[in-house]
């Protein structure tokens, strides 16, 4: 991830106790910063390989609140984001540009540069989409997207909203229902 999006600075979240209790900590951070600066210099502004398509994370917020897909503090358990944390961590180091889209984006037409849509979260939450999945425009747009070669990945309870005898509204696409 650091090679794909180089850092200009490193912060350690206000853990001043690290500096006071372990004097060698500052020296080690200085060494790490030096290594990153060397990587920047060696890269000479070149970009790393990126897949020819984007991966989209689909939730109720989309780009407006992309930070809502995860929580900032990694050591505190958040039930609502548990499913998504591993997905976002994996994507951060992979050769994909990631875009966050919402259901209005899907209704308006899935952007042509998106090759995979990921829907992650618990049922009936803004993370997975809740009642958006009973909107025929949404499910039709994603079925068409997959039919034309796009990928759809679900984690947790994707597309979940009990409706017309189905729990996962795209069970036909995913090959599984609850």
Predicted regions and their residues:
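Hydrophobic targeting/anchoring helices
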Residues: 1-80
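Loop/turn elements at helix/coil->beta-strand transitions in domains of secreted/extracellular proteins
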Residues: 5-9, 51-53, 94-99, 112-116, ...
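Solvent-exposed loop/turn segments at secondary-structure junctions
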Residues: 16-18, 61-64, 123-125, 158-162
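Acidic-and-aromatic substrate-binding clefts and catalytic sites of carbohydrate-active enzymes
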Residues: 17-22, 104-109, 131-132, 160-162
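A short, well-structured beta->alpha microelement
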Residues: 88-110
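Short, well-ordered secondary-structure micro-motifs within conserved domains or adaptor modules
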Residues: 109-131
């Amino acid at each position: 991830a650091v090679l794909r999006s180089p850092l200009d600075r490193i912060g350690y979240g206000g853990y001043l106790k690290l500096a006071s209790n372990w004097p060698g900590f500052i020296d080690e951070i200085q060494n790490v910063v030096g290594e990153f600066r060397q990587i920047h210099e060696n890269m000479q502004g070149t970009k790393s390989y990126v897949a020819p398509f984007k991966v989209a994370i689909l939730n109720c917020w989309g780009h407006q609140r992309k930070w809502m897909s995860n929580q900032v503090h990694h050591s505190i358990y958040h039930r609502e984001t548990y499913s998504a944390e591993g997905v976002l961590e994996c994507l951060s180091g992979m050769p994909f540009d990631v875009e966050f889209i919402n259901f209005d984006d899907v209704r308006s037409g899935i952007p042509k540069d998106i090759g995979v849509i990921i829907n992650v979260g618990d049922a009936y939450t803004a993370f997975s989409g809740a009642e958006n999945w009973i909107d025929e425009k949404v499910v039709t747009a994603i079925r068409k997207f997959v039919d034309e070669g796009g990928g759809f990945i679900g984690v947790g309870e994707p597309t979940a909203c009990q409706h017309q005898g189905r729990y996962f509204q795209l069970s036909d696409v995913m090959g599984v229902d609850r």
